[in-house]
């Protein structure tokens, strides 16, 4: 009779301890009673093999950040290209990029050789995203993602998945989940990767056994190169060229969808040509034309599929152009 009684007592104490811990987590987790919290846990458990206890522990102390919702719902301000460009193509950022390039030249060259992605493009992304690590964000990533997962219905599924990916990644790497900081939308480190992309495309490029995009510039360089390669970067192919347009119907040449390029010969007949007469483009090359607004009117670029690959990082054509031009300037110095 003694052993069964002891077993029952042990089970009762274990259950009580679990309930006590869950109660403490519930009190410290502002999202515990949200109607979607259970479904979030179930999906995270199925997708990543996490336990209920691991998820509750990772979410312990999670706080709602209303200012993030204010940022997300604030109407976006559309800047013309010449104003957007001035946010990144400035001497201070360029000089910071040159110092970064000089410090990590060997790593940049290794990534270019391995993945076929020019170091200029890697440098451009690092400069536009975080100013070469100067501004990686200051929001607790767990709280930012939880706020959006449970308080921003329009993209709740996306941010819920990213929150689960964050918890999984931090357990794998041994980081406290609440120690990760980043942007208000949950992007992390030098390259501002979302947690799911860290899991899928992050690279341990310094060989220390961890993918640490917050502190390892080498990991950031390798991860950006791997990302672009996986999204279709074409080795030894151009990004694009400045162009001039001699026609009077720009809508006929501007790309509506960068994934559907046009043979250059067709666009040339409509009046688009490279600014530099020494640039030769084969009539069969598949290219797009983009239009941006400078102080003095429209400017044009003929872009190759590699330009479209940059837009998978951020869909803005101005973003991709800033990456291209900033990186080219930094790499040339």
List the model feature ranges, each with a label:
Residues 86-223, 229:
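Acidic/His-rich structured neighborhood in mature extracellular/periplasmic domains
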Residues 24-28:
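Sec/Tat signal peptide C-region and signal peptidase I cleavage site
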Residues 11-22:
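Bacterial N-terminal signal peptides
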Residues 284-333:
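C-terminal functional modules
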Residues 29-103, 109-112:
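An acidic, Gly/Ser/Thr/Pro-rich helix-cap/linker signature
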């Amino acid at each position: 009779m003694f052993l069964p009684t002891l077993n029952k007592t042990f089970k009762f104490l274990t259950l009580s301890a679990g309930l006590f811990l869950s109660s403490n987590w519930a009190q410290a987790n502002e999202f515990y009673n949200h109607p979607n919290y259970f479904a979030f846990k179930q999906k995270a458990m199925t997708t990543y093999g996490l336990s209920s206890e691991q998820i509750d522990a990772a979410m312990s102390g999670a706080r709602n950040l209303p200012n993030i919702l204010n940022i997300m719902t604030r109407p976006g301000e559309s800047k013309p290209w010449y104003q957007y460009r001035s946010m990144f193509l400035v001497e201070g950022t360029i000089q910071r990029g040159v110092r970064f390039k000089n410090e990590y030249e060997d790593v940049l060259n290794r990534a270019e050789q391995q993945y076929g992605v020019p170091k200029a493009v890697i440098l451009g992304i690092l400069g536009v995203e975080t100013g070469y690590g100067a501004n990686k964000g200051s929001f607790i990533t767990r709280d930012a993602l939880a706020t959006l997962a449970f308080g921003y219905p329009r993209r709740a599924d996306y941010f819920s998945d990213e929150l689960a990916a964050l918890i999984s990644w931090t357990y794998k790497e041994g980081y406290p989940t609440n120690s990760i900081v980043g942007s208000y939308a949950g992007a992390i480190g030098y390259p501002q990767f979302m947690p799911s992309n860290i899991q899928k495309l992050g690279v341990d490029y310094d060989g220390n056994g961890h993918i640490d995009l917050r502190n390892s510039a080498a990991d950031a360089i390798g991860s950006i190169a791997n990302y672009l390669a996986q999204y279709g970067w074409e080795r030894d192919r151009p990004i694009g060229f400045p162009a001039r347009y001699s026609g009077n119907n720009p809508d006929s040449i501007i790309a509506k969808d960068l994934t559907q390029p046009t043979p250059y010969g067709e666009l040339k007949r409509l009046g688009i040509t490279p600014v530099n007469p020494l640039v030769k483009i084969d009539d069969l090359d598949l290219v797009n034309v983009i239009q941006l607004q400078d102080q003095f009117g429209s400017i044009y670029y003929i872009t190759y599929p590699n330009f479209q690959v940059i837009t998978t990082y951020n869909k803005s054509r101005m973003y991709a152009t800033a990456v291209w031009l900033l990186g080219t300037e930094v790499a040339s110095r």
